[in-house]
A protein has these predicted regions:
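Active-site segments of SGNH/GDSL-like serine hydrolases
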Residues: 297-301, 313-342, 364
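Short, aromatic/His-centered strand-loop micro-motif at the edge of beta-sheets
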Residues: 138-165
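Secretory/extracellular carbohydrate-interaction modules
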Residues: 68-141
Length: 420
């Protein structure tokens, strides 16, 4: 733990690829991006298509060359109607782009640029830039993207109309965009390695539209990849995602990933989720990349049922995945089905009956580590964020560290990756 807790921030800039004219804007560059991103192997396809019928379309049309835009403005978007939660995700497009095009790529759970920690990136051929927009209030509600630019990278001067590969990469809390000329192989890239959601979390389906330009761009193919057969995936809602954590390196799943560098670890979580949302992840995610172990923390948004847990266990069994169901943190709620006492009593009863283990996040975050799930179990308020209300709901950095410390105590086989 000491190695993690002593991580320092700095303002170094790094050029991780020798053939790239991109720039890394970073305050955590002590973490090797080359090792974590560019040498990543063992991916699996979540989606691959060249056909208009696989997208939600407004005015784009199918041509011999591919899927072509027919107008400008966000009303003329094309949408990949798939909602991926996995935090290692590689979206790759082959495009034909006009010399005057400004293309927008927005991940949104509601309207374009709005929702749960959305993101918005762009290719601006006329001004020879690729860039990322800022997310408003990344340590608070983080519900929409601003018009302010977070960062830009210059294209090589000889980039003109033609075919390009555009990659959008999410790796943990990092966002990377890279534009590569199909013929010359020259590229430019931009990396956000901030430890808060400065440019969003790429949450929600991908929307693409032409903001400016007379030459209509063409999508020749679109692919989405993720890590195949990870050793562990941490699954849940905003608490697992790291909502309101002032340094995302201290999320429980992130601490585990840093402490286990030789293992494949993912986080698949989204603010506002319930058990129903987790069950829906199997069709588009878990059944495809088949994690070996799944650590679930769910219930703060209500919706837990023993039947839902039965379905979760069955779906995990079907793909050969070991399930761990953790107790909820000791948060405050006025809604009966969301109170940690109600949620944790249900989890305990079901887990004992089904021989399922889970970490005691309730003990970790309770005042005086009181292990009784009743009204006397009050939260340790020093372990919760004050950026949103209710205050005692989202663990802060200190709270996530205390939660992480429960893993070797309650789940030693999982934490030490013991083969049983």
């Amino acid at each position: 733990m000491e190695k993690i807790i002593e991580l320092k921030q700095n303002n170094e800039r790094i050029y991780p690829l020798s053939n790239s004219q991109g720039v890394l804007l970073s305050n955590t560059s002590s973490i090797s991006l080359y090792d974590s991103i560019y040498s990543l192997k063992g991916m699996i396809s979540l989606f691959s298509s060249k056909a208009l019928g696989d997208f939600v379309n407004t005015t784009w049309t199918q041509t011999e060359d591919g899927i072509q835009a027919a107008g400008i403005g966000e009303d003329n978007y094309i949408k990949l109607n798939k909602d991926y939660f996995c935090d290692i995700k590689h979206t790759r497009l082959k495009l034909s782009i006009g010399s005057d095009n400004k293309l927008i790529f927005a991940f949104s759970t509601k309207n374009i640029g709005h929702g749960v920690v959305p993101s918005k990136f762009y290719i601006d051929m006329q001004n020879k830039k690729i860039g990322m927009y800022k997310l408003k209030n990344p340590l608070g509600h983080a519900e929409y993207v601003l018009s302010d630019v977070w960062g830009e990278s210059d294209m090589p001067l000889d980039f003109a109309a033609g075919e390009y590969i555009f990659e959008i990469i999410k790796s943990s809390y990092k966002s990377i965009i890279r534009l590569t000329n199909y013929l010359t192989g020259k590229s430019c890239e931009l990396i956000c390695d901030d430890t808060i959601w400065s440019v969003g979390a790429q949450n929600g389906p991908l929307h693409i539209y032409l903001e400016n330009g007379a030459e209509m761009p063409v999508i020749k193919s679109l692919d989405v990849f993720t890590l195949n057969n990870p050793d562990i995936v941490f699954v849940g809602d905003s608490i697992t995602e790291g909502f309101c954590v002032e340094d995302l390196r201290y999320r429980v799943g992130e601490l585990f990933r840093i402490e286990h560098p030789n293992h494949k670890v993912m986080i698949s979580a989204r603010g506002g989720c319930t058990i129903a949302a987790i069950l829906s992840r199997f069709e588009d995610e878990f059944n495809i990349y088949k994690p070996k172990k799944m650590v679930v923390n769910i219930g703060a948004n209500g919706g837990n049922t023993k039947g839902g847990f039965d379905s979760l266990k069955q779906k995990c069994d079907d793909i050969g995945c070991t399930l761990y169901l953790c107790y909820n943190v000791c948060y405050t709620s006025t809604v009966e089905e969301r109170k940690h006492q109600y949620v944790n009593n249900m989890i305990e009863e079901w887990s004992i009956l089904n021989h399922i283990e889970g970490a005691r996040f309730d003990i970790a975050t309770a005042a005086n580590n009181n292990p009784v799930n009743d009204e006397s179990q009050l939260p340790n308020e020093d372990l919760f964020s004050r950026n949103t209300q209710p205050y005692n709901l989202h663990p802060n950095k200190a709270g996530q560290i205390e939660m992480y410390k429960r893993l070797p105590i309650d789940l030693p086989n999982m934490h030490y990756l013991v083969t049983v």
